[in-house]
């Protein structure tokens, strides 16, 4: 997941300092004893989980805290600190959070600054080895486990099988962005094309960043290019109204689309594998806004997933998002925190929360529970995409007011992209 948030200017000097410090104190390796069981009953752990929210933990987070508490005897509280806040807490050597869960784009910063606890654990090492390679690439620091993956997701263009039959579209025919937009805009049938324009733009922007910016050390990052402005104008040239979220030309937004999850009405839509819970053709009293998803397997039986279109022929991989857990190097409960991570690693889907229950973590198909429907074509579609996926390894902390002003007509395309470039340059050179 790529999180972009305005960085308070008063905090910038501290954030920059973080990139050159060693973490404030030596990080000792933690080894969980396998020879003697330790009773952690009564221990309280604070987990920074941005989806679970502040205490008490909700069911929307990365982990199933209720089940973890039952099985470990540990009480969990959760907190929500965003990127800038997390960095400041680590810089201040704060010990109140025991486990942080962060986006993959944040990991390189924490790794280079030494803000992690090295882990020695056969259980976690075996777990990481079983995950997709794209996850293991960010798990190790100086040959020690430092960051444990807890989520992996990839977005796709979702197309009903019936629409594929009608249009004879194939992944190859809409492999590139312009071809995809042409397919949608020239379609003259009764189906409606849906998308989530902001999320689609983020995925295309990730392609651009992965393709051109392998690191930010040279402080030379350029968004004022015809290629980037083409993405910007094609995807973001829409306005929102009081009663409806806008969408890219030729589309309706899938959050307001009455039939975006209906294989009989949609031409295409946008989503990840977790979208499965929201797809059904069943409507209550033919009301398009009231649909019955309970027990529906329509997603697995009636839909296929095509890769997000490429912005150019130079793009050779799919853009994915992930989240990693790490033990706060300043935590006073490192052993208990490691025990929790080992518990999760021993049976991932048992302890996965709502935000990660559909994560395709593993390279072995037999590792997935029944609700993944691994024999379905759409599972194979997503699974194959992840075999050739890359994660964004940095994040530009910008508020993206440029997009708001562009869509409001306050800035031209050139002015909007120049404003974003200005924000990026400030971040690079502080």
Give the location of each predicted region.
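Extracytoplasmic "Venus flytrap"/periplasmic binding protein-like
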Residues: 70-131, 167-168, 260, 267-268, ...
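Hinge/lid segment of periplasmic solute-binding proteins
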Residues: 102-159, 300-309
């Amino acid at each position: 997941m790529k999180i972009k948030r305005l960085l308070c200017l008063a905090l910038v000097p501290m954030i920059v300092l973080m990139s050159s410090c060693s973490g404030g104190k030596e990080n000792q390796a933690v080894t969980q004893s396998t020879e003697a069981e330790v009773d952690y009953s009564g221990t309280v752990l604070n987990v920074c989980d941005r989806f679970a929210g502040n205490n008490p933990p909700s069911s929307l987070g990365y982990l199933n805290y209720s089940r973890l508490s039952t099985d470990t005897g540990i009480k969990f509280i959760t907190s929500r600190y965003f990127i800038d806040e997390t960095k400041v807490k680590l810089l201040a050597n704060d010990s109140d959070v025991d486990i942080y869960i962060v986006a993959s784009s944040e990991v390189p910063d924490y790794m280079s600054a030494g803000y992690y606890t090295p882990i020695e654990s056969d259980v976690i090492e075996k777990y990481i080895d079983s995950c997709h390679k794209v996850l293991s690439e960010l798990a190790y620091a100086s040959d020690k486990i430092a960051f444990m993956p807890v989520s992996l997701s990839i977005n796709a263009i979702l197309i009903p099988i019936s629409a594929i039959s009608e249009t004879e579209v194939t992944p190859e025919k809409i492999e590139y962005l312009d071809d995809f937009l042409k397919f949608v805009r020239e379609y003259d049938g009764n189906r409606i094309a849906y998308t989530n324009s902001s999320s689609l733009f983020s995925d295309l922007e990730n392609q651009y960043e992965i393709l051109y910016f392998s690191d930010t050390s040279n402080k030379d990052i350029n968004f004022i290019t015809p290629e980037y402005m083409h993405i910007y104008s094609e995807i973001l040239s829409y306005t929102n109204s009081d009663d409806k979220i806008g969408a890219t030309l030729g589309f309706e937004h899938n959050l307001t689309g009455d039939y975006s999850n209906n294989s009989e009405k949609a031409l295409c839509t946008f989503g990840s594998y977790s979208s499965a819970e929201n797809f059904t053709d069943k409507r209550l009293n033919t009301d398009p806004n009231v649909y019955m998803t309970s027990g529906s397997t329509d997603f697995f039986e009636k839909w296929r997933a095509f890769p997000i279109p490429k912005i150019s022929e130079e793009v050779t991989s799919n853009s994915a998002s992930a989240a990693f857990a790490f033990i706060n190097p300043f935590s006073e409960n490192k052993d208990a925190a490691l025990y929790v991570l080992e518990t999760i690693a021993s049976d991932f889907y048992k302890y996965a929360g709502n935000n990660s229950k559909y994560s395709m973590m593993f390279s072995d198909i037999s590792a997935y529970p029944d609700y993944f429907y691994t024999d379905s074509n759409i599972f194979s579609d997503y699974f194959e995409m992840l075999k050739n996926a890359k994660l964004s390894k940095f994040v530009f902390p910008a508020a993206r007011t440029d997009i708001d002003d562009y869509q409001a007509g306050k800035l031209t395309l050139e002015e909007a992209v120049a404003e974003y470039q200005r924000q990026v340059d400030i971040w690079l050179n502080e």
